[in-house]
A protein has these predicted regions:
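Ankyrin-repeat boundary/"N-cap" motif
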Residues: 74-83, 103-112, 132-154, 177-195, ...
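Intrinsically disordered, low-complexity eukaryotic regions enriched in glycine, serine
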Residues: 1-100, 110-114, 119
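Leucine-rich solenoid repeat scaffolds
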Residues: 314-339, 447-450, 459-506
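Extended, hydrophobic interaction surfaces within ordered domains
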Residues: 38-66, 291-339
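Ankyrin-repeat intra-repeat helix-capping/turn positions
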Residues: 88, 115, 159, 198-199, ...
Length: 513
């Protein structure tokens, strides 16, 4: 049952008391939805803001208005439906619409995202400006493009396209965009929403055919993540230019030789690397041969890159591609560079790391973490998702390489192991003392990071996020009361519901999800 406004106000006061008492979980809740810049004293309104954001509203005034207009219970279910459509949580969509078939009534953005052509036509018949009016953070075209409802109702594709045509006829733009978040104005295009976010090739093709810009700085890069080449081919066909982008480097993350071939044929240059921070984040990729080294690219990929002109003499953060190949254990690349006579000498620290990578006996050797080059400081986090790296990781830990240090995004190896759905490594990091209270740079805890990975990790189908979640729960992590309802994976939702019932002592109000 949804809490009343008065109860939520009391929750805000309780959160403030806990925050001012420096309780870890209260601090995490505020950090997950920061109402003000760091170190700015917080007021009562700021804690109301956190309570509203945890309830999936943009602000306390937005929550209060929704409660006054239609009742808090219905408003809360509408917010949950919006999230479910955006994330593609089919079982949540089904339950909400089965329980309340008219839940989208009066919510134009929801009606667009649900491909309700009849309702949208009715609204536009009396209010043509509705087609271009921003609703929340998104215009109607972005509500349509970022909806993953097509995977829940694929037979509604014709209605989806008819709705897109209707919006366009009433003034909407195929080049509409939306900010990443309320506090981050980096823009994500409707085309990215359709192709990169929603994996909706039907709508992506329609947008491109009607003039969407294929060079939006996001779509081509993220099209390499989808596990197929339809998006990459579609974008290249409509003029996407891979030169100067990191799309080729991202395709290497997935060992996708075919995508790399397509991008090279379209003009991609293997020595291109754009280190510009996007939306406040550093790139997830690095120059091609260094990328090949740390991703353990195989012979076909290495030969393809070298044939296309990748420079073995290129350095990144002061380290050669050859050193990377040895340190990360990619002997295929190391041999290829040696064959070209371009193998520089390794530093003493690199020799120790290379020995650990090759399976050599590290004996009593230890690395002073303070002397570890920055390029290798996060090596455990960088390799843990790769097959067969468990023993390598243990040798690195034995050498003294930090196993619980956060990277630039605040992600620790434990968080990444949980996100990747790797229970053996999740358990290993917990057993050797990783910090269970750590909150990463995205505001996530270990539990919320596992839930996020269960819906977003590209390899989630063959991973085991449920076992990672059990490991975290058995270690005693706090469980937000709404976690079972927030989980997008029905298996994890049921697991959490059962755990909450059997372990009420771990249940907490609010918190990152």
């Amino acid at each position: 049952m949804t809490k009343s406004l008065d109860q939520l106000r009391r929750d805000a006061k309780a959160l403030r008391r806990a925050y001012e008492a420096d309780e870890i979980y209260a601090r995490q809740r505020v950090a997950n939805h920061p109402p003000r810049p760091d170190d700015t004293p917080l007021k009562h309104a700021d804690f109301l803001h956190v309570i509203a954001r945890e309830a999936q509203f943009e602000s306390w005034p937005a929550l209060k208005l929704a409660a006054e207009l239609q009742g808090l219970d219905r408003a809360a279910r509408q917010q949950r439906l919006k999230t479910a459509i955006f994330q593609g949580q089919s079982h949540v969509i089904e339950k909400l619409l089965t329980d309340t078939p008219d839940l989208a009534e009066g919510q134009f953005g929801l009606q667009v995202a649900l491909y309700d052509l009849v309702a949208v036509k009715a609204v536009l018949a009396v209010d043509q400006q509705a087609a271009v009016r921003t609703l929340g953070l998104r215009t109607p075209m972005c509500h349509l493009a970022f909806s993953r409802y097509i995977h829940h109702q694929p037979d509604r594709a014709d209605d989806m396209i008819a709705l897109a045509e209707l919006l366009l006829a009433h003034g909407a733009s195929v080049n509409d965009s939306m900010p990443v978040a309320p506090d981050n104005d980096h823009q994500l295009s409707a085309l990215y929403g359709a192709i990169g976010h929603a994996n909706n090739m039907i709508l992506g093709q329609w947008l491109l055919e009607h003039g969407a810009d294929p060079n939006d700085g996001e779509s081509l890069y993220h099209a390499t993540e989808l596990g197929h080449h339809e998006g990459v081919r579609l974008l290249l066909k409509h003029g996407a230019d891979p030169r100067g982008t990191n799309a080729l480097l991202r395709a290497m993350d997935f060992h996708d030789v075919e995508a790399v071939r397509l991008l090279l044929a379209a003009g991609a240059r293997p020595n291109d690397f754009d280190g510009t921070h996007v939306g406040g984040e550093r790139p997830w990729v690095i120059p091609a041969l260094h990328q090949a080294a740390r991703r353990m690219s195989g012979r076909e990929m290495v030969e393809l890159l070298l044939a296309a002109g990748a420079d073995p003499a290129d350095t990144y953060e002061g380290h050669s591609a050859y050193a990377y190949a040895r340190v990360f254990g990619n002997q295929v690349l190391a041999d290829a560079i040696e064959a070209k006579g371009a193998a520089p000498r390794l530093s003493p620290v690199e020799e120790m790391l290379a020995n650990a990578a090759s399976g050599g006996d590290i004996g009593g050797a230890r690395i002073d973490p303070a002397q570890l080059p920055g390029a290798y400081r996060d090596i455990i986090r960088m390799i843990l998702h790769l097959p067969g790296k468990g023993d390598h990781i243990k040798r690195l830990v034995g050498l003294g390489v930090p196993f619980d240090a956060p990277d630039a995004e605040g992600l620790t190896p434990l968080h990444v192991a949980g996100w990747e759905g790797l229970p053996e490594l999740t358990t290993y990091f917990i057993e050797i003392g990783a910090n269970l209270d750590h909150q990463n740079g995205y505001g996530g805890t270990l539990l919320s990071t596992i839930l996020h990975g269960s819906e977003n990790c590209p390899q989630r189908a063959e991973r085991d996020h449920a076992a990672c979640l059990v490991a975290a729960l058995q270690a005693g992590v706090p469980v937000p009361r709404r976690a079972p309802d927030a989980a997008g994976d029905p298996v994890l939702a049921d697991l959490l519901a059962d755990w909450v019932h059997r372990h009420p002592e771990q249940v907490v109000d609010g918190g990152p999800l």
